Amino acid sequence: MDLKEQDYYSIIQRKFVELFESKGCKAYLEITANKRFSNKLKSKISDYRHIIFYFLKDVAPDITGFFEKGSFTDFVIIEVKDEEIKLDHIYQVRKYADLFEAKFALLVSTKEIPAEIKALSKVVYPVLSAPSIYQGRTLVYFDGETQSFKDWYPENPFEKELYWQ
């Protein structure tokens, strides 16, 4: 069975909710590839930041949401690609991350992460950098056959305690 990109959304959404819950967080993720955001999601955006939705009318992350731990609420955006990751995909995810001030921006591909992208991120540091050490910008290889995450670059944020303190 050949799956299309949108067929992966709910699978990946569920997998990430499980990962956030494994870190003791309450997670809410919704599929937003249709450029529609629920009132529940919008209610977590500060009033002064609602202007971001003007810029999301034409393009939006595939999956958008937030997670709560204690009194903190942080945003997460997930972009899914059923093709090899390209540099333009990374900048697309960065744009969404900046608009939402996302703690985590994840670019998930059903193809292995290209060695060239990994090499580029080592010589052009800003490619995967985040505004803060407490924010993660991560490339992820999702194996559709086993329905599992196989590779995280530069690191798996769910295994780094710095993000969860």
Q: Which ranges hold each PLM region?
A:
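Intrinsically disordered, low-complexity terminal regions enriched in charged/polar residues
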Residues: L3, D7-S10, S121-Q165
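Well-ordered alpha-helical segments embedded in enzymatic catalytic cores
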Residues: D62, Y91-Q92
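Active-site metal-binding core of divalent-cation-utilizing nuclease and nuclease-like domains
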Residues: K26-D74, I85, Q147-L162
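N-terminal cationic-hydrophobic initiation segments that often serve targeting/anchoring roles
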Residues: E68, A97-D98
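Nucleic-acid nuclease catalytic cores
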Residues: E84-I85, H89, D98-D143
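Conserved beta3 VAIK motif of the Hanks protein kinase fold
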Residues: I78
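Nuclease catalytic cores
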Residues: M1-E30
